[in-house]
Amino acid sequence: EETYKVYPFHFHLEIGYRLEDASVSVMWKVKNINDKEMHFAIGAHPAFFCPLHEGEKQSEYCLGFRNGQGKVPEALVNTVFGEGGVVTTQKKEYKLTDGCLPMDEHLFDGDALVIEDHQIQKVVLMDPQKKEYLAVEFDAPLVVIWSPPKKQAPFVCIEPWYGRCDSEIFDGELKDRDWENTLAAGEEFEASYRIIVE
């Protein structure tokens, strides 16, 4: 009932986990239990240890990317975060070298990388020798990657999102937000992502 005060929809959410070899799949099921349309967004918030070993720095590590065809993109376009947790209309392009984006000391200075439009379906963490040690696979239209700037935090988050926070120029209803999802009465939404330890 507390949720209903700020989000005027009744829903049923199921989250499941499946372990298989060196991977874990996370499954979501959202059911609209209203007698009207429901608008929603859902996303994951997994964080991964980085750097792996004592004496290493996160800035020595690299992010690798694959698109939906398993190919390595030449560049990524990031939607830039602004003040107050909203995205701006600004875009920033990152050129990749062999599909790799170094996690230098300034990569997250502007907050998170927000990669939209199904540009990628897999993010890989690579150690200083460019050895892949962890991957996140997903079908989500967006992925958000971040680590606290200027804090040398020992983790990086790789978050598949079905939906996104508001844009700084957004002025409308929930149903009109970019990347918002809609379910008719009684309908269900299902999605998943997979974490693979290499």
Task: Name each model-derived stretch.
Residues 168-176:
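Short, structured beta-strand/loop micro-motifs enriched in basic residues and often containing a Trp
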Residues 14-16, 178-183:
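Beta-strand-rich interaction surfaces with strong enrichment in secreted/lumenal proteins
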Residues 28-34:
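Asparagine-centered strand-capping/turn motif at beta-strand->loop junctions
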Residues 37-39, 47-138:
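Active-site/ligand-binding surface loops and adjacent short beta/alpha elements
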Residues 13, 24-26, 189:
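Hydrophobic core residues within well-ordered beta-strands of beta-rich domains
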